[in-house]
Amino acid sequence: MAIVKDFLYNNLKHNIEAGKMQYGVALETTSAEVAEVLATTDYDWLFIDAEHGPHNIQTILNVARAIAPYEMTPVVRVGEAAAGTFKQLMDSGIQNIIVPMVESGEEAAQIIRWAKYPAEGKRGMGAGVVRASRFGRIPDYQQRIDDESMIMLQIESLKGMENLDAIASTKGVGAIFLGPADLAVDMGLGPNILHPDVVAKMEYAIKRIREFGVPVGTIAATPEQAKHYADLGVSFFALGADTAFLASAADSTVTSFKAELEK
């Protein structure tokens, strides 16, 4: 049976490398139907949040299958980093993984070892029988996957900021994702990502990471803040979430009808 699509080609990675801004949306629920609805929009990538959402490997795989016919690229943020986590996700065909709360160069190096095949890493070999290689039908899977995958390390604490250089300079890091909400909390400011002190930390981090030639992603509270960070070098954003959209639309609808009917 012929393979009619290059399943390994990583749209998100190549578009970032080509200088095309990439817009992402978070999936906090485990619904494959909601994921497919989001895949019909103009968002470029789906932020499958297995850190704060109740995802497991099966729900992640169901979501990835649901959006596979579309141009949207799946990105999984794991709850915690471990060798087994990387094997399961990557063998299931997930090529873009965000690891939260990375705080040192040593942590960064260990994560990359879990994600890469020897000699660059220690990822176990099971490619011949798993979805990632389309069950052995992509003969050059092992040769290509390390170049096509993108492992993103999330810096979101004061300690992570202190060790930014060591993290960003780690060989094999695909991108750095900055988490201003946790950073703000760590600074004693609550989740206020618009606070001037948080913005100053973010500005420094973005410019410094770009000096290492590493792509930077983050979230933004407003279009104006996103534009400011993009001007500094951010090339991909996570903007909004399925649960927030649903709550906002529900509130707006019932409020408008109540306002008219209860005059």
From Swiss-Prot:
**Site-annotated residues for Transition state stabilizer:** 77
Q: Which UniProt keywords apply?
A: Lyase, Metal-binding, Pyruvate
- Binding-site list for a divalent metal cation: 156, 182
Name the cofactor(s): a divalent metal cation
Output the Pfam families linked to this UniProt entry: HpcH_HpaI
InterPro entries per the record?
Aldolase/citrate-lyase_domain, HpcH-HpaI_aldolase, Pyrv/PenolPyrv_kinase-like_dom, Pyrv_kinase-like_dom_sf
Q: What class of enzyme is it?
A: lyase
Q: Give the top-rank taxon of the lineage listed in the UniProt record for this protein.
A: Bacteria
UniProt key word Metal-binding:
yes
> Catalytic center at which residues?
52 (proton acceptor)
Q: Which GO terms describe its molecular function?
A: aldehyde-lyase activity; metal ion binding
Whether Metal-binding counts among this entry's keywords is yes
Swiss-Prot/TrEMBL site (Increases basicity of active site His) positions = 91
Q: What is its EC number?
A: 4.1.2.-
Can you name a GO cellular component term? cytoplasm
Reactions catalysed, semicolon-separated, are: D-glyceraldehyde + 3-hydroxypyruvate = 2-dehydro-D-gluconate; D-glyceraldehyde + 3-hydroxypyruvate = 2-dehydro-D-galactonate; 2-dehydro-3-deoxy-D-gluconate = D-glyceraldehyde + pyruvate; D-glyceraldehyde + pyruvate = 2-dehydro-3-deoxy-L-galactonate
Family according to the record: Belongs to the HpcH/HpaI aldolase family.
Protein role: Aldolase which can catalyze in vitro the aldolisation reaction between hydroxypyruvate (HPA) or pyruvate (PA) and D-glyceraldehyde (D-GA). The condensation of hydroxypyruvate and D-glyceraldehyde produces 2-dehydro-D-gluconate as the major product and 2-dehydro-D-galactonate. The condensation of pyruvate and D-glyceraldehyde produces 2-dehydro-3-deoxy-D-gluconate as the major product and 2-dehydro-3-deoxy-L-galactonate.
PANTHER family per record: 2-KETO-3-DEOXY-L-RHAMNONATE ALDOLASE, PHOSPHOENOLPYRUVATE CARBOXYLASE FAMILY PROTEIN
- From the Swiss-Prot or TrEMBL record, give the protein name: Hydroxypyruvate/pyruvate aldolase
Species of origin: Actinobacillus pleuropneumoniae
